[in-house]
Curated annotation (Swiss-Prot):
This is Small ribosomal subunit protein uS17. Belongs to the universal ribosomal protein uS17 family. Part of the 30S ribosomal subunit. It comes from the Bacteria. InterPro entries: NA-bd_OB-fold, Ribosomal_uS17, Ribosomal_uS17_bact/chlr, Ribosomal_uS17_CS. The lineage of its organism: Bacteria, Bacillati, Bacillota, Bacilli, Lactobacillales.
Amino acid sequence: MTEERNQRKVYQGRVVSDKMDKTITVVVETKKNHPIYGKRMKYSKKYKAHDENNTAKVGDIVKIMETRPLSATKRFRLLEVVEEAVII
């Protein structure tokens, strides 16, 4: 069981929305080579993740893991809050 879970995708990103109950929106930024020119391009993708205890807040750096479909758009769950946001 644990070996299978280790093959699931794990991403690290920043929480941009926590307005939904038990759901957060995480932006994951990655770099990819352009297919023709070879330049490293930065791109980002938003994922909705399940946050059972509503622990993550906007601005936090979190780790999310791929899981079974939890709703029409949720395919990830919160693993841990790596770094909490600094409130000014």
